Every structure is written in C-alpha cells, then in structure tokens.
C-alpha cells in the first residue's frame, strides 16, 4: 500500500470544487501553476512548463495547457509535452522553469499531480491540504472505533473534522448545481473532436414516463450523466474523488434527495460517510487514473456512493462497509483508456453505470447481516497492487484499449478516404 500519509486525511482533501474535465490534469496542474507563480520573488520574463508522462499523453484533451496559461496570468508560457514515462516518480509529473530575459532558468520546481486536485513534491504534500485528522488508517480500525464508542461513520466525521456541516453544505450545493446545469443544458454536443452527444436531458425526459423500477434506473442514470457531461464541458463540479468520476456520488445523492424526498441533513451525513471511505482509499492506495487506472477513480466513486446509499437506506456500520466493498471489488482491474484523451468515452457512461451499480450494492448489502469474507481494506490493497501491475497503456496514456482502437479506426479512415468512414452514430456513441 501507499505510505505517503500516516493516517486517513480530512474528507475535505477529497472534495474539491473546480472546473473539469480532470482533477489531476486540470485542477491539479492549474493549482500547481498558481503556486509556482506565487513562489517567485518577482514575475519571470517567461515560464517553461514541461509536462511528463500521462500529463503529456492526454493533457491536450484534458485542457491542461489552457488551465496553466490561465493560472500564469498573461506571462509568456512555453509548454513542452514529454510523453516519455521512464523513471518518473509519478506519472503526472510537471516541471516549472522560471526564465529571465535572456531565457536562462532562474528558478525550477518539480511537482506531482497525484489525483483529486492534490499536489506533492519531493518535500511532501503541497498547498492547502489539511493535516491527517483520523487516528486510524483502515476502515476496519475506524469501524471498530465506531462500534466501541457507539458512533455512526458520519458522527465520527462530525467529531473529527473542523466545522464540517457548513463546508459540506457548500460541497452539496455545488454538486446539486452541477446536476441541474447538466439536466438543463440545451447544448447538443460536448466540446472536442468526438462530437459526442449529450444524453442527460433526454434520458431524464424519457425516463419520467416509465414505470418503476425502470423509472428509478433512468433517473439515477440521468443525474450521473448530467454531472459527467458538465465535467466534460469544463463546467464546475466537485471531485468525488476525481473529476473523471464526479458524476457517481452526486447522481446517487440527488436521486435520494429529489426522488425519494430524503431531507438535506440525511444527504449531508451520507456525503460525510462517503468522504470518509474515499479518504481511506486515498490514504492506502490511489485515486489517480494515471497511477492505478480507472478502478482508482470510478471504482472509488462507486464504493463511496454505495456506502452513502447503504446509510441512506438505514444500514448498519457493517452493511455500509459491505456495500462499499462490493462497489470496489467489482471494479478491480478497470482500465483508464480515454479516446483522444478526452474525459468523454468511456468516462461519461462509466459514471452512469457505476451509479447504478452503487445503488444495487447498497440494496444488496441491506439484504445481508453485513458479514462477508473479503474486507473493504483487503479490496483496497488489491486495487493498489492491481494498478501497479497494469501496463502504462491502460493508465491514462491513451495508448491502449478503446483509445488505441479509435486511433487505428481513424488511421484507417484517413487512408481509405471519406467514402469508407464509419457511420456517424459510431463516431458519437462508440463505447
């Protein structure tokens, strides 16, 4: 397991409000650029930014360069895309060089965008990350603590975090707003060369006319799609635990709040519990697709949403843990292979299916007494080891899987000419 943190950190390290489409490639890199500029005693004549590994491989589709230029506030920027992943301490590595008038480097900084918008350099965590607050590192230990003290998971969060409820209110309001914007959007297509059609609004409108349980599935799908499409369009979302997986948890919570009518306080408590499970994953493994594949992003989001759903259904501590375990276990090995580097295919529909799976995990866990053979912590350990074993082509480099399939298809089309191009519906909906 990862040993970067001595214990589980604050849930507010996990939930960050920012612009998509990627927490590591967009939010993290923009934060790094702002921090680098703030470190300079005087504004440099120009800045050279070298993006390594995954940041170079998929950064254009993730709008990495745009965020960096925005953060450097008009200073001339040279961006170098170095896709060589050899000997990197982290696949999302950035080097900033402040340049004088003659082009000579006056100051340099190497930093790593480790997922969820968080940063680390060779001295440790960077920025406004809150210190580790929880006394234990695993859910097994936290569960035992809650049982001994008669606490629920959300009460442990309340007891441990600094003024959590107003902050969770802000996070939930941002999540709600992202769902509503996605549902209300009249844009037919998402930005980028794929011309991928938005589906959230039509899914909502068609789903309302169905009878349950199909209606419930359609609404869950619409809510998750809405956030994911907003993220893909560069809209403001909440990392949960990342931008690429930002639709799963809000989709679940929005459903229980607006369709099932659960009060806002219940939603905030579920958000607290989900954040605790996500923080355990971050402390013991990774939430970065570039490091462990999409199992660390959508798999983690499904696990968090399953825990939240089980709590909202009235589950016990052990049933909540079981739901979270199922959510992650059945995403093990999930690759990160975005077509053209855009957080669209397979990312958007993957958020939708993970939201549906999370709802199923929560329901099933409550049909049991919560006892099971493989613990949540065991699965997180396996997830991290599996991610380390994944070939780099399947860890957000757009060199394998669906990305490679698409590249070969487009290459064949360019050679054969427009007459042999794939049908338009394949171009828009291939997943």
Where are these regions (language model features)?
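Alpha-helical support elements that line or immediately flank enzyme active sites
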Residues: 26-39, 250-261, 306-314
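Accessory "access/gating" subregions that flank catalytic or transport cores
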Residues: 166, 176-289, 293, 401-431
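C-terminal regulatory domains involved in ligand/effector binding and gene-expression control
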Residues: 74-209, 219
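Conserved phosphate/anionic-ligand binding catalytic regions in large, soluble enzymes, centered on
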Residues: 15-33, 233-252, 294-302
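Short alpha-helical scaffolding segments that buttress acidic/His motifs in well-ordered protein cores
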Residues: 14, 18, 220-228, 270-278, ...
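A structural-propensity feature for long, helix-poor, extended segments
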Residues: 46-82, 269-313, 317-323, 329-361
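Non-transmembrane, aqueous-exposed alpha-helical and coiled segments at domain scale
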Residues: 2-7, 12-16, 30-55, 61, ...
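Functionally critical mobile loop/hinge segments
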Residues: 309-431
């Amino acid at each position: 397991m990862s040993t970067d943190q001595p214990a589980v950190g604050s849930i507010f390290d996990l939930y960050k409000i920012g612009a998509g489409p990627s927490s590591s490639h967009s939010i993290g890199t923009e934060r790094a650029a702002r921090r680098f500029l703030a470190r300079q005693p005087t504004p440099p004549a120009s800045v050279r930014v070298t993006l390594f590994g995954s940041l170079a491989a998929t950064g254009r589709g993730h709008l990495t360069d745009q965020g960096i230029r925005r953060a450097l506030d008009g200073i001339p920027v040279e961006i170098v895309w170095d896709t060589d992943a050899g000997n990197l301490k982290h696949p999302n590595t950035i080097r900033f060089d402040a340049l004088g008038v003659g082009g000579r480097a006056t100051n340099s900084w190497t930093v790593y965008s480790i997922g969820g918008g968080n940063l680390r350099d060779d001295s440790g965590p960077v920025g406004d990350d809150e210190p580790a607050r929880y006394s234990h590192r695993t859910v097994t230990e936290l569960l035992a603590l809650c049982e001994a003290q008669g606490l629920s998971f959300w009460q442990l969060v309340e007891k441990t975090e600094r003024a959590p409820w107003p902050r969770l209110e802000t996070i939930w309001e941002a999540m709600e707003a992202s769902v509503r914007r996605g549902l209300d959007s009249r844009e037919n297509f998402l930005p980028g060369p794929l011309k991928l059609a938005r589906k959230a609004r039509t899914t909502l409108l068609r789903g309302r006319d169905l009878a349950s349980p199909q209606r419930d599935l359609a609404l869950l799908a619409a809510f998750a799609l809405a956030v994911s499409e907003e993220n893909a369009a560069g809209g403001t979302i909440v990392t949960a635990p990342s931008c690429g997986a930002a639709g799963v948890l809000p989709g679940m919570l929005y459903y229980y709040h607006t369709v099932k009518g659960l009060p806002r306080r219940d939603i905030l408590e579920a958000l607290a519990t989900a954040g605790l499970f996500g923080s355990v994953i971050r402390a013991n493994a990774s939430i970065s697709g570039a490091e462990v594949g999409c199992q660390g992003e959508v798999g983690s989001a499904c696990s968090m949403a399953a825990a939240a759903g089980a709590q909202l259904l009235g589950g016990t501590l052990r049933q909540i843990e079981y739901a979270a375990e199922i959510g992650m276990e059945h995403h093990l090995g999930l690759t990160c292979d975005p077509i053209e580097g855009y957080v669209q295919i397979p990312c958007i529909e993957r958020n939708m299916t993970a939201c549906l799976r999370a709802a199923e995990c929560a329901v099933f866990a409550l049909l049991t007494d919560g006892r099971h053979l493989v613990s949540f912590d065991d699965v997180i350990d396996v997830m991290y080891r599996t991610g380390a074993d994944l070939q780099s082509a399947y860890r957000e480099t757009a060199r394998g899987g669906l990305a490679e399939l698409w590249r070969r298809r487009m290459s064949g089309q360019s050679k054969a000419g427009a007459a042999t191009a794939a049908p338009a519906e394949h171009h828009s909906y291939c997943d």
